[in-house]
Amino acid sequence: MNPMTNRRVAARLIAGCTVLAAATAAWSADVTMRISHQFPPAHHSAKNLEQFAADVKAATNGKVDVQIFGSAQLFKPNQNHSAVATGKIEAAAIVGFTLGGTIPEMNVTLIPYYVTSLDKMKKFPGSEAAKLLDAKLLDKGLLNLGWMVDASDGIFTSAKTALVKPADFKGVKIRGLSKLFDEGLIAMGASPSAMPGSEVYQALQTGVIDAGFTGVAAAYERKFYEVQKFGVASNIILAHDILVVNPAWFNGLPADIRQAIQTAAHKAEQRSIPKSADISAEDVKNLREKGMTVSVLTPAQEKAMAEAMQPAVLKAFQASSPDAQKLIDLVNKL
């Protein structure tokens, strides 16, 4: 190889290294979006978030690396709010009603048999009611990207006898959801203890509580059938998992990246809405196949439960915030 050829090869190598360095620099500038959540891998919301990550990757041509940390690996459920708001992590999926102590209005969908129709579920995201709540979340350092339905139903599980009518709850130590929802349980004579879904199985197993409450699908995913004999399902509440991000982090992203993430969040939101307001026959079947005796309340039985629970919960909600009645009026318009 002559000197001229050597110089040409060297020039090409230098040019190639320059391109590689530029590509490496560009890659190092890519966005990392870490999401913390409490759900086990089999949980439907965990699977929805995995699809969200895939959608973001596809939409951004791999420029955004969505890293998901489920099963409370990084933060406990009650730590996610602070972690996102202070920038310790970019994002989290939080069960909305768990923020009810900080933002009382987040409990509105826990009013028994109130926001559980399929029509209201479809209309809620993007509604004036949702916008009011989004504004309150932003005031607390959380930018909400989506309202993912966690459960549009609920199942009371028990070991000794099925909890079918209000009188069956008298004296029962039961998993509560929030101070607000628990007013309805207290009205029926139960003794609720609020706790995250991740803690319920052990509480049932050790006898800390007698009865559980969760979504029908979650009862299967969290293996309640191993520690409970009976399950009574109904369209009692609407629970959302909100996908929240740190506002400063999100607003600092390029516009196209923000749009891709928001679009993927909207898809996750839409995927989460059930096809029917009926209790999933598949979810009931799954529990029955594991040996649990499961029944679904009739409309008349739901009415009896609503009459026993709703007045106390509604009264507590109206007293919880100056904006409570405004929110109720907005939900009534859905």
Language-model features, listed with the residues they occupy:
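N-terminal secretory/targeting leader peptides
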Residues: 2, 14-16, 29-120, 128-334
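N-terminal export leaders
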Residues: 6-11
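N-terminal signal peptide c-region/cleavage motif recognized by signal peptidases
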Residues: 23-24, 28
